[in-house]
Structures are given as C-alpha cells and as structure tokens.
C-alpha cells in the first residue's frame, strides 16, 4: 500500500475518498494524528495525485459533496475538529507560506503602532546611495502594507497560490520564486515611483503567472490556475494602469512580477519536457 497524503480534517479526507470511489479508485483512511489516505493499487498513484491536486485547489466544489451523497458517507461517524476552516488553512500552506504571512502581519502591526515612515526607513528599497549595501532592503519591501484591504487581498492570494506551489513543488521552489520576483519587481517599481512603495503584490503576480503557465504546459505538476483568474489579474493591471478606481497601485511591480512568473514557468516546463 502507498500513503497518498494526510489531512488534519477527517471530513476533508472522507470527501476525497468518496470522490475517488466514484472514479473507480478505492482509497482507505487510517486515523493517527491526522487522517492518512492510503492506496492499495499503486499503479493508480499518478492518477490519484493529479485528482488530489485538483481537490486541494477547490475542496468545496459541488462534485465532491455529490460524491459523498452518492457513496452514502456524508456522515461517516468520525469526530470532526471544531474548526475545519483553520484545518483547511493549515492543509494548504507550508512553513514558508506561513512565515511570509506572519512577517507581513507583524510588519503591518508595527506600521500601525509606530507609523509607516518609521518602518519604511528600515525596510524600504534603498532610498539613498549609502544604503545600497543593506541587502535586505531589496526584499523586505514585500512585507509592508498600507491598509487592511491591501494586506488581506495580498495574503489571500499568497496563501492560495504560494501554498499550492509549496505543497506540490516544495519550499525551495516557493523561495526561489519569491526572492527573484521580489528583487526584480521591486527594481522595476522603484524606477516607476521611487523607493517609497511596499506590498506583496509583485510576488503574487509572479505566482499567478507561474501557476497558470505551469499548469497549462505541465498538468502533471499538480498546480493550475483557472483561466478566468488570470484574465482577472490582467484586467486588474489594466485598471491600475489607467487609474480606473482612483487607487494607488504598484503597476510596475505587477507587470514585472507577472513576466517573471511566466518566464520561470516557461523555463521549468521546458526543462521538464527535455527530461521526458
């Protein structure tokens, strides 16, 4: 037998098992600290992993609930945790995803308590030639956010996309995407607006581009982004460029981040195709 994955929430595990049963694949759940899912027929492992990636992207899809009704397992008799929402948050995010989220929250609280300018003096892109060797500044601008809506919007996308990349491709891949996109999107943005900017959106756009193109060119990677969402991302760039909503947006960072993500996905999928 082969262990496929583990879920903190047994209801989520049961939903996936029920769905796979409707697809002719028999999985079993073993309860330990988490709900471990096991596959007896290892020849079906790749198919199960592809379906698992789709399930993790949208576990609330009606087809999964319908599968539970079909199998008669909507009430499995398991004792579920009281906070399935928190369990879902944990299941979709790895350590790097959480560390970046925590850093953004801590910096946002600091900016609220001691003021934006005080924090920016320490974390902003080098605003004086004497600061160019303070290397952290080329990356720490991603942790600064200037409103509650700003940080919530960015962290939601970071959790959704960054968590998927980390879970499927590993923490190393997420770190590489984050570091490169933070550096290059920050460089472009400071050319547009000067050094006084901040936010995770350049990295988020890199993840959008990466996840979408990687999913299109390499479906076996287990990550994908619906085309409707990438269209939304492009429309948001256009809206920011023409200032449709009267909001200050880091247009340079958005465009640069998206290009970086697309380029990295293209290179990764090109290498993957050469290996096959």
UniProtKB/Swiss-Prot annotation:
It is found in: Cell inner membrane. SUPFAM superfamilies: Rhomboid-like. This is Rhomboid protease GlpG. The gene is glpG. InterPro entries: GlpG_N_sf, Peptidase_S54_GlpG_N, Peptidase_S54_rhomboid_dom, Rhomboid-like_sf, Rhomboid_protease_GlpG. The active site is at residues 201, 254. One of its GO terms (biological process) is proteolysis. It is a multi-pass membrane protein. One of its GO terms (cellular component) is plasma membrane. Belongs to the peptidase S54 family.
């Amino acid at each position: 037998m082969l262990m496929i994955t583990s879920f903190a929430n047994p209801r989520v595990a049961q939903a996936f098992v029920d769905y796979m049963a409707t697809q002719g694949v028999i999985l079993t759940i073993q309860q330990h600290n988490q709900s471990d899912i096991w596959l007896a027929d290892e020849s079906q492992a790749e198919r199960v992993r592809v379906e698992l990636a789709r399930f993790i992207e949208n576990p609330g899809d009606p087809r999964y609930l319908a599968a539970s009704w079909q199998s008669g397992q909507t009430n499995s008799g398991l004792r579920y945790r009281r906070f399935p929402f928190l369990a879902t948050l944990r299941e979709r995010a790895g350590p790097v995803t959480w560390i970046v989220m925590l850093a953004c929250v801590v910096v946002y609280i600091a900016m609220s308590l001691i003021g934006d300018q005080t924090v920016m003096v320490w974390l902003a892109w080098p605003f004086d030639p004497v600061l160019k060797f303070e290397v952290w500044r080329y990356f720490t601008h991603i942790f600064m956010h200037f409103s509650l809506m700003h940080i919530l919007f960015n962290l939601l996308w970071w959790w959704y996309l960054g968590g998927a990349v980390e879970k499927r491709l590993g923490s190393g891949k997420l770190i590489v995407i984050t570091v490169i996109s933070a550096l290059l999107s920050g460089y472009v943005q400071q050319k547009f607006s000067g050094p006084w900017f901040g936010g995770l959106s350049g990295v988020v756009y890199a993840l959008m581009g990466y996840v979408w193109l990687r999913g299109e060119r390499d479906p076996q990677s287990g990550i994908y982004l619906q085309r409707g969402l990438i269209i939304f991302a492009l429309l948001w760039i256009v809206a920011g460029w023409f200032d449709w909503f009267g909001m200050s947006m880091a247009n340079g960072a958005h465009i640069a981040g998206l290009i970086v993500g697309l380029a990295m996905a293209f290179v990764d999928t090109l290498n993957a195709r050469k290996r096959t």
